[in-house]
């Protein structure tokens, strides 16, 4: 890959990440990383890692953890590998693989955490982007939600956690697939742009082989009075400082 097509984005705490036109990140990834890193993590797998943002945010704050970033895109893995090397994320391991072949490249049944910011749209739903890399990130062209959760269940150890974000309209499907694969939904949080707005995103944690019992957290509001809410300022914290 031509390195001139990448640029470094500050993450705070003296860390940065390389992004490309095809592999960047948004607010949903930052929120998912914050949602996931509240748990005790020794070994985590980020499925569909892209530029690696979720894994790198976890490692920025939990440097002793080990994170395996998995993506089918060689371009994404190249950028993530360069970030790990250039900015000192020594416990990040990039893996270029699809889900079918992953068992040959990564140990199953032993990880504390799987995180995934999946394609939000089903394969044939809505308009698609002509750029195949962007299309793959947004639509389930390479794997379905069912595929992701089935592989997550195999990666996790007993009591390991799956943390995902998704669109509210697919929440029922997400919870059903988790339960069918012995990942019990245990924590749910909705995200709204501001008070009075419909939910924009859902954050969900499921626990492998856990008892039933779902906790619903208070809503997270991105904006208050036209500005970032206090909670968003906390979440963006050192990342925002890196852009000051």
Description of each model-found segment:
Residues 118-147:
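Mobile active-site "lid"/loop adjacent to the S-adenosyl-L-methionine
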Residues 11, 88-89, 179-182:
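Short, structurally constrained coil/turn elements
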Residues 198-244:
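SAM/dcSAM-binding transferase cores
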Residues 2-43, 49-51, 56-61, 202, ...:
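SAM-dependent Rossmann-like transferase core, predominantly class I methyltransferases
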Residues 16, 66, 91-93, 184-187:
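Conserved beta-strand segments of alpha/beta enzyme cores
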Residues 25, 142-193, 197-199:
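Conserved Class I SAM-dependent methyltransferase catalytic core
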Residues 34-127, 150:
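Conserved SAM/SAH cofactor-binding pocket of Class I
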């Amino acid at each position: 890959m031509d390195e001139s097509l990448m640029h470094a984005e500050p993450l705070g705490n003296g860390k940065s990440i390389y992004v490309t036109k095809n592999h960047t990140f948004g607010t949903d990834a930052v929120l998912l990383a914050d949602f996931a890193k509240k748990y005790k993590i020794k070994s985590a797998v980020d499925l569909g890692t892209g530029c690696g943002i979720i894994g790198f945010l976890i490692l920025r704050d939990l440097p002793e953890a080990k994170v395996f970033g998995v993506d089918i895109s060689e371009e994404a893995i190249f950028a993530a590998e360069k970030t790990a090397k250039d900015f000192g994320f020594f416990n990040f391991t990039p893996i270029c693989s699809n889900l079918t072949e992953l068992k040959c490249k990564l140990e199953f049944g032993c990880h504390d955490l799987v995180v995934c910011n999946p394609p939000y749209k089903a394969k044939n739903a809505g308009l698609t982007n002509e750029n195949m890399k962007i299309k793959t990130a947004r639509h389930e062209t390479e794997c379905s939600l069912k595929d992701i959760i089935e592989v997550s269940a195999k990666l996790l150890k007993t009591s390991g956690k799956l943390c995902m974000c998704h669109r509210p309209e697919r929440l029922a499907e997400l919870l059903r697939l988790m339960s069918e694969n012995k990942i019990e939904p245990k924590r749910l949080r909705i995200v709204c742009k501001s008070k009075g707005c419909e939910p924009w995103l859902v954050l969900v944690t499921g626990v492998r082989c856990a008892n039933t019992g779902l906790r619903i957290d208070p809503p997270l509001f991105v904006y208050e009075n036209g500005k970032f809410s206090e909670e968003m300022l906390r979440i963006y914290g050192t990342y925002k400082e890196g852009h000051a």
